[in-house]
Amino acid sequence: MSDEEQTAIVCDNGSGMVKSGFSGDDAPRHVFPSIVGRPKNEQAMMGSANKKLFVGDEAQAKRGVLALKYPIEHGIVTNWDDMEKVWHHTFYNELRVNPESHNVLLTEAPMNPKQNREKMTQIMFETFGVPAMYVGIQAVLSLYSSGRTTGIVLDAGDGVTHTVPIYEGYSLPHAIRRVDMAGRDLTEYLMKILMHTGMTFTTSAEKEIVRNIKEQLCYVALDFDEEMTNSAKSVSEEPFELPDGNVMQVGNQRFRCPEALFKPALIGLDEAPGFHEMTFQSINKCDIDVRRDLYGNIVLSGGTTMFKNLPERLAKEISNLPPSSIKPKVVAPPERKYSVWIGGSILSSLTTFQSMWITKSEYDESGPSIVHSKCF
């Protein structure tokens, strides 16, 4: 047996992207959208060997004739049949392995409903026949990948944003903040504010175009009011080429869109805290003795933290909150888009971790609820 046949599989199932690969690697082997596409019109797809279902990149490539669905919304699996299809695609088509020969480490957002991880556990053992599995909390894995054991992780992906304070390797659950606002909400907000330019994006395929605009052109304003004033004085626009070859100009929407991360009321979440307030509230729920260490190690994780100027703006907003003597340090690792996966790769390759796996025999004895006692 080759080493790879023995190696654990690490699969970070995000609301927007699946990151998968092997334990011990320094980056995921495969990254693809967490989407399942079905033909809008059965007749139109005759050429594709009558396939009824497309997953990931293939669904993305054929999006013009497909209805696209994301099986994970706000970090919670809402369609288990489709989720199974995504896992099947991950194992057999992307990684090209038989899951019956590999332990599997999966990831999950904190404060998810208990049945979500129970069902994940059940499917891994009963449908895919894995020998052992584990579910890691996304933010904790991110901190491992940054080489720290103490810090507060702000993890913002496509479906969920959460702040998790961790001290000496232990997460402090009472202080976790979670808001169901992340990248997908920004994409929808951008669709809305681009309508004023006369462009309408309505279908699931057009939403993917707007996501590309967001990822390529949007940035965080260091000072929003100043940026608005400047953009009113001089028209500053960036071109974006649409799939049909037309070019649209994108103006102040480029910084108005990510502003919602600091002012969630812009997208109708009047009660939700912004990134800076979430971080601040989480730290203040921790013991006074550990707060300084947490302020000094605010670690960003996830694709929605990749906007230009976001780390600087976050530090500025937090330092404006009391007590003013605190000087926050925001750490923005360049690989933070994949830091959850990297943390899973590190954790699952440690010799000390090997006793942490939930084995098939433990599952047979205790059932899916074993996941709560063995995975924190």
From Swiss-Prot:
Domain of life where this protein originates: Eukaryota
Any coiled-coil regions, as ranges: none
Record's keyword terms, sorted: ATP-binding, Cytoplasm, Cytoskeleton, Hydrolase, Nucleotide-binding
GO molecular function: ATP binding; hydrolase activity
Claim: NADP is one of the keywords in the record: no
GO cellular component, one term: cytoskeleton
Catalytic activity as recorded in UniProt: ATP + H2O = ADP + phosphate + H(+)
SUPFAM superfamilies assigned to the protein according to its UniProt record, in alphabetical order: Actin-like ATPase domain
UniProt cross-references to InterPro entries, sorted A to Z: Actin, Actin/actin-like_CS, Actin_CS, ATPase_NBD
Function: Actins are highly conserved proteins that are involved in various types of cell motility and are ubiquitously expressed in all eukaryotic cells.
Protein name as annotated: Actin A
Species: Trypanosoma brucei brucei
